[in-house]
Amino acid sequence: PQNDVWRHGHCPVCGSPAFIGHLSGPEPSRNEGRDINKGGKRMHTCSYCRTTFRAKRIQCPFCLEEDAKKLDYFTTENEPGYQVHVCRSCKSYIKIADFREFFGRESIPALDDLESLPLDIAAQNEDFHRVAPSEWGL
């Protein structure tokens, strides 16, 4: 079920890696520009079969690192609603759509991936790599 957290680094249906994710749940509260509400669910979408499944919030979906000091994320002003979650252990990243503040906006994984393409470039410029290919061949 979608409410169960899948703690493994691959799709529960076909075993492929996730290519993008999104946050769902309550809107985040803000304190000096940072999220302080840790509520909401982190959902990932499989790169092969497109199954959406719930993932652990503080964990690299690829190497399963859980040390918060090795996990981080960044955003840019030019791509509101998107985060890039990076792992310093395996140097991978995954983009996460966070539309909780955009009333009525829904995550559509393939379109989210295309719309946030500049974030792939930013992550790769910082020497992070994408594990699962995008719909667009990147």
Where are these regions (language model features)?
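Cys/His-clustered metal-coordination modules, chiefly Zn-binding fingers
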Residues: P1-A123, F128
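Short flanking/linker segments adjacent to small metal-binding domains or redox-active Cys/His motifs
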Residues: R100, P133-L138
